[in-house]
Design a protein with these regions (language model features):
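Cross-family detector of peptidyl-prolyl cis-trans isomerase
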Residues: 1-153
C-alpha cells in the first residue's frame, strides 16, 4: 500500500492512489459506514479526510472500464443510478472456506529484488526517453508487486 507519514506526529495513513478501496461518507466525519469506493485516479486531496482500508490487487482493468461521471456535477458522482455501473456482488475472501481462498504473494520490502523494483520505477532508462527524466518516484505508481499463486497442498 502507498502510505503517507508525518514523522513529527508519529502518524501514518493509506493514500488515495489508483486501486485504493475507501469508505465514503457525508460531510460529518463520522457518517461513513455502508458505502465504499475504488479510487480510479490519484485523489491525494482526499488523504486523511476519508479512510482507505484496502486495495484492488486483481481486476483493476474492469474497474477502470466503468462509466465516469462529470466532475463538474456532484464531484463526478453519477446521480442517476441507471446511467452508472452496477456491481452485482462481491465476496469477502475471509468468508470463503480456506481451501477456496485465492492465495497471493507480495514482494517483501527487504532485499535486492525490492530495491531493484524501486530503482526501475525511479530511474527511467528506456530508449523512449531522448531526454533523461529526473529521478523521481511517484508514490502512486509504486505498488508492491503481487501475484496469485497456487494454493499449498
Amino acid at each position: 500500500f502507498p502510505v503517507g507519514r508525518d514523522e513529527a506526529l508519529g502518524q501514518e495513513w493509506l493514500l488515495h492512489c489508483p486501486g485504493a478501496v475507501a469508505l465514503a461518507r457525508n460531510n460529518d466525519p463520522n457518517s461513513g459506514g455502508t458505502e465504499i469506493y475504488i479510487v480510479l485516479d490519484a485523489q491525494r486531496y482526499l488523504d486523511r479526510n476519508l479512510t482507505v482500508f484496502g486495495r484492488v490487487i486483481d481486476g483493476m482493468e474492469h474497474v477502470q472500464a466503468f462509466k465516469r461521471g462529470d466532475r463538474a456535477i456532484s464531484n463526478g458522482v453519477i446521480q442517476a443510478p441507471e446511467q452508472g455501473e452496477e456491481i452485482l456482488g462481491l465476496t469477502i475472501v475471509a468468508d470463503l472456506p480456506e481451501d477456496q481462498r485465492p492465495v497471493w504473494r507480495t514482494m517483501t520490502s527487504e532485499g535486492e529484488p525490492f530495491a531493484e523494483h524501486k530503482r526501475a520505477l525511479r530511474v527511467r532508462e528506456s530508449e523512449f526517453f531522448y531526454r533523461k527524466p529526473p529521478e523521481v518516484l511517484d508514490i502512486c505508481s509504486f505498488n508492491t508487486p503481487a501475484e496469485r499463486v497456487a494454493a499449498a497442498d
